[in-house]
């Protein structure tokens, strides 16, 4: 909504969003489509979409004149329905697509310029007829949200949906998901789904599915090929491997991270090589890391006991030690500290965190240390302050990603309460989250 003054004039002119209007200001005339006000925009700035496609804002003030020209379009959105049903070859493997939302399930409203959730898994499949040559597939939309709205409780819903599909005899599962928190979900599923017998691929898109530059088609085609035909029984992310449309990377779910806000090849393996390259055109799957779980005949188990009151705290110069008091008052049960370098926090400075950390551990609340460097591993013995923190009970999480450690601590706290048990579980490699040795050619790939 615009300001009361602007809205009063629009109502008087019987003008609404979608109408073509003319605005005269300072002897200049502007003509275009009246747009909704940007949510965080100025209440008195009228937004026009010009005929060239650009939006402009015009400040409404004394002397500004508005004329209605005609009604141009309605803002009412109708649900997109699949136009036809794809027919698959019964000789091909059966896979399942589970929809959770995100950009991959969104389209642009070019009139307003916004992206909104629109496509169901069925809609996406309809855009990719080549899928009928890869596998038979069934679709199930369990939610349609942008990934910033994902919660630990929704991870459990996804895990249960995946397990149900797998235990029905499906050969692989593809999960469509928003990219921003996709690696949190991939880590969560890696811990919650035990004895995984088939591949599970989380796939997203950096560009909405109706755009010419969308990465949806290639990402889904590669992910479908991966879960249908590979011998990998792991939770993986499957996204563009380069800026070009040549191949996707299958990256272990606990070692994958979004490393760019908008590039199509944003998801990279951290501290290890990707498990596979999946080539789009010829559908060749090249294994690039032989350390993976193979397909098997086990029944997947859902282990969804978690404690969601875990905080992920980033260390920065001047951080106030009292920030931890807030979390303690909120009864948080665990902390992952993203320290500097090898796992440092201010230990002997004027804003030392040492006493705050000691207080937390004395309450039998675990403190886990990761590095904001992303690559490499933390180490409790290289410098004296690190030794001090370690002696107080801080758990140094090897080369775990901060996001993975955050999710893992939730899962561990669902199974252990004593600090020694928690430490043992945090340092046990359950889903490839810890590598014994970080190889040099795993950096920036």
Language-model features and meaning:
Residues 203-280:
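Internal gly/pro-rich beta-alpha loop/helix module
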Residues 139, 379-419:
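Interaction/scaffold regions that mediate signaling and macromolecular assembly across diverse proteins
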Residues 1-88:
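Conserved RNA-binding domains used in RNP assembly and mRNA/RNA metabolism
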Residues 8-9, 55, 65-67, 74-164:
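ATP/NTP phosphate-donor binding region
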Residues 167-182, 330-344:
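Short acidic, glycine-rich surface-loop motifs adjacent to enzyme active sites
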Residues 98-99, 109, 118-121, 126-131, ...:
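Accessory alpha-helical/coil subdomains and C-terminal extensions
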Residues 175-198, 347-356:
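Short Gly/Thr/Asp-enriched flexible loops that form oxyanion-binding sites at enzyme active sites
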């Amino acid at each position: 909504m615009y300001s009361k003054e602007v809205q009063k004039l629009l109502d008087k002119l019987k003008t609404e969003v979608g109408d073509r209007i003319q605005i005269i200001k300072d002897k200049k005339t502007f003509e275009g489509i009246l747009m909704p006000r940007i949510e965080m925009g100025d209440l008195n700035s009228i937004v026009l979409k010009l005929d060239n496609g650009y939006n402009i804002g015009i400040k409404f003030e004394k002397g500004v004149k508005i004329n209605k020209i005609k009604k141009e379009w309605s803002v009412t959105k109708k649900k997109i329905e699949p136009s036809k049903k794809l027919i698959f070859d019964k000789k091909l493997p059966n896979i399942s697509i589970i929809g959770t939302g995100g950009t991959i399930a969104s389209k642009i409203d070019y009139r307003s310029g916004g992206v909104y959730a629109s496509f169901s898994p069925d809609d996406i499949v309809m855009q990719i007829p080549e899928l009928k040559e890869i596998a038979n597939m069934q679709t199930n939309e369990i939610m349609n949200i942008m990934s910033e709205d994902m919660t630990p409780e929704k991870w459990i819903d996804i895990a249960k949906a995946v397990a149900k599909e797998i235990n029905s005899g499906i050969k692989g599962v593809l999960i469509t998901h928003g990219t921003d928190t996709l690696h949190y979900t991939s880590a969560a599923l890696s811990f919650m789904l035990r004895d995984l017998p088939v591949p599970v691929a989380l796939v997203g898109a950096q560009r909405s599915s109706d755009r010419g530059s969308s990465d949806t088609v290639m990402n889904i085609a590669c992910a479908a090929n991966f879960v249908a035909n590979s011998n990998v029984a792991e939770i993986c992310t499957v996204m563009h491997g380069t800026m070009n449309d040549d191949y996707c990377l299958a990256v272990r779910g606990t070692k994958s991270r979004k490393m760019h806000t908008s590039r199509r090849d944003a998801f990279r393996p951290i501290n290890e090589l990707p498990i596979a390259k999946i080539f789009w055109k010829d559908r060749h799957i090249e294994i690039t890391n032989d350390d993976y779980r193979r397909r098997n005949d086990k029944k997947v188990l859902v282990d969804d006991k978690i404690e969601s009151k875990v905080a992920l705290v980033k260390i920065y110069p001047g951080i106030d030690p009292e920030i931890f008091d807030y979390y303690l008052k909120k009864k948080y049960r665990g902390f992952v500290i993203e320290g500097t370098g090898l796992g440092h926090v201010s230990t002997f400075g004027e804003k030392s965190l040492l006493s705050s950390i000691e207080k937390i551990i004395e309450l039998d609340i675990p403190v886990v240390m990761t590095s904001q460097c992303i690559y490499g591993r933390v180490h409790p013995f290289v410098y004296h302050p690190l030794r001090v923190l370690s002696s107080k009970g801080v758990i140094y999480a090897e080369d775990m990603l901060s996001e993975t450690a955050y999710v893992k601590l939730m899962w561990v706290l669902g199974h252990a309460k004593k600090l020694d048990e928690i430490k043992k579980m945090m340092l046990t490699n359950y889903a490839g989250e810890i590598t014994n040795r970080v190889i040099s050619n795993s950096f920036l790939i």
